[in-house]
């Protein structure tokens, strides 16, 4: 048994990454430790693509074991049960930086699993999970572009602290999770207590410097014990079908994708897609629906990016920095509802309902890692299928809904009055009425208004906005030019290079989430 390890000297406690001791039948496996917090992270990828597979089936699972904290699980059966909200948020946080590192068209079933084996109550395992997932992929035989590192940044007494302990976080003005490669940000997430813009930017720079150290250590580990990369095939648009697609749609795609309303745009695009499908299947009867979809998506994305970069032209006709029309209304429901508000930005609309209750109604949570175990301010986000004019599953929350709710909650939380000033439990329910991009930011705006309507003495109103990015790159994948978009719609999120959600008050930043 050959065991190899590296130590990353960043933050309050060094991070140790070890491989070769546990889970040796996985494609990649590492044990990551900081203080007495230990996680095992594994990755396994199938060697064949399932028939009919049309996307990259990456699943990321994170599980906290009660034994890790020397505790018994609650409940009658004394076993760990369904994922907690914290586990789901850690899954999302681990997933998002990994996904861009796999090649486009890699459709092999891939699973990353993180198990919390030991929790010391001070060092949070979420950062270890992200670093471990990257390291497991790096030492495996999977096609993984380059290492990803992650750190948490706090700001205590005016000084930035890398990977603060839970005790330190109680006194921090900032809670920033930053994941990236040696020279590029991939994901940021967190909250702040109305942090000034210049301090927020400085925190990002400090985070990038420390992430670089972690990435270099992962490269050292790969050089010593990394496996030879496997052979694989990519599912990409076929050139002969792409040629037919351009014959039919090349001169007409721009007219189809540019319309003031989402419904009109979908109708035009759908009709043109049907023409492309008919032409392709007439000449190539063996072509599948997925082949057609890849061709049309390629053409559509190319047209979108050319129009932004060369013409400054957006799908709904706005200028690059122009907001959609805003509408807002409070007390939209009878007074039996404590506070209600509706906020719409173009075709995105949130209806928020605020409820006050005695402190006994606060939420209590099982906690094995020493972080927050109760909340008196809760925001729940619900995304029914009718909000996009569709049918589908109704009831219960998926990971996306939990993630969006958490973003809106932590963005408003810094302005909620303390328990001594306002001794009530507070719940906001955001019901998405219409969706065409940035529903979480609409939830922040509507949620703030509903709280004010309910009589909650917020320090200041909070607002949120989304920012997009479209880039051009050279053969070395270096950005040569770019355009930023303000208040992005759904297609700009899908075809663009970035979705950056930023919330704050007139005094500073309160919440944020960025994905590339």
Specify the residue positions occupied by each region the protein language model found.
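Alpha/propeptide regions of enzymes that mature by internal proteolysis
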Residues: 3-4, 8-13, 27, 38, ...
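Conserved phosphate/anionic-ligand binding catalytic regions in large, soluble enzymes, centered on
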Residues: 28-30, 38, 123-141, 329-354, ...
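Glycine-rich, flexible beta-strand/loop modules in the N-terminal catalytic cores of phosphate-handling
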Residues: 27-110, 116-123, 182, 189, ...
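Flexible, glycine/charged-enriched surface loops at secondary-structure junctions
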Residues: 104-110, 145-147, 214-232, 263-264, ...
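Mobile "lid/hinge" segments at catalytic clefts and subdomain interfaces of large enzymes
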Residues: 141-260, 451-516
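Extended amphipathic alpha-helical scaffolds
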Residues: 1-46, 50, 54, 233-372
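Extended, hydrophobic alpha-helical segments in both membrane/secreted and soluble proteins
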Residues: 133, 403-412, 424-453, 458-467
């Amino acid at each position: 048994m050959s065991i190899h390890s590296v130590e990353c000297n960043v933050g309050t406690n060094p991070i140790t990454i070890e491989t070769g001791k546990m889970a040796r039948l996985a494609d990649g496996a590492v044990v990551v430790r900081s203080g007495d917090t230990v996680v095992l992270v594994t990755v396994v990828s199938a060697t064949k693509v399932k028939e009919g597979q049309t996307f990259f089936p990456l699943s990321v699972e994170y599980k906290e074991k009660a034994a890790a904290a020397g505790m018994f699980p609650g409940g009658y059966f004394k076993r760990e049960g369904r994922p907690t909200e914290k586990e789901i948020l850690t899954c999302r946080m681990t997933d998002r930086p990994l996904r861009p590192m796999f090649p486009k068209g890699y459709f092999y079933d891939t699973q990353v699993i993180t198990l919390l084996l030991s929790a010391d109550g001070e060092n949070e395992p979420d950062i270890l999970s992200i670093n471990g997932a990257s390291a497991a992929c790096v030492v495996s035989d999977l096609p993984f572009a380059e290492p990803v590192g992650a750190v948490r940044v706090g700001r205590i007494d005016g000084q930035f602290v890398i990977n603060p302990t839970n005790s330190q976080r109680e006194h921090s003005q900032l809670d920033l999770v930053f994941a990236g490669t040696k020279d590029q940000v991939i994901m940021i997430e967190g909250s702040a207590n109305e942090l000034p813009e210049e301090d927020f930017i400085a925190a990002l720079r400090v985070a990038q410097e420390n992430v670089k150290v972690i990435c270099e250590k992962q490269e050292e580990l790969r050089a010593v014990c990394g496996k030879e990369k496997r052979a694989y095939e990519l599912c990409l648009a076929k050139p002969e079908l792409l040629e037919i697609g351009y014959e039919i749609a090349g001169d007409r795609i721009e007219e189809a994708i540019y319309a003031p309303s989402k419904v009109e745009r979908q109708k035009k695009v759908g009709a043109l897609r049907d023409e492309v499908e008919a032409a392709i299947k007439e000449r190539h009867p063996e072509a599948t629906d997925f082949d057609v979809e890849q061709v049309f998506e390629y053409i559509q994305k190319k047209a979108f990016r050319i129009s932004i970069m060369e013409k400054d032209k957006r799908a709904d006709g706005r200028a690059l920095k122009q907001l959609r029309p805003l509408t807002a209304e409070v007390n939209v429901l009878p007074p039996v509802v404590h506070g209600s508000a509706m906020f719409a930005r173009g075709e995105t609309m949130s209806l928020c309902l605020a409820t006050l209750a005695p402190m006994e109604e606060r939420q209590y949570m099982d906690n094995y890692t020493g972080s927050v175990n109760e909340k008196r301010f809760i925001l729940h986000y619900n995304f029914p299928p009718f909000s996009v004019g569709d049918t589908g599953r109704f009831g219960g929350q998926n990971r996306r809904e939990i993630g969006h709710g958490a973003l809106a909650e932590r963005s408003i939380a810094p302005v909620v009055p303390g328990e001594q000033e306002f001794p009530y439990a507070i719940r906001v329910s955001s019901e998405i009425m219409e969706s065409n991009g940035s529903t979480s930011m609409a939830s922040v705006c509507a949620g703030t208004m509903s709280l004010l309507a309910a009589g909650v003495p917020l320090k200041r109103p909070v607002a949120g906005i989304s920012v997009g990015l479209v880039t051009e790159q050279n053969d070395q994948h270096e950005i040569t030019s770019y355009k930023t978009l303000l208040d992005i719609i759904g297609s700009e999120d899908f075809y663009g290079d970035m979705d950056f959600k930023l919330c704050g008050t007139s005094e500073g930043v309160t919440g944020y989430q960025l994905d590339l």
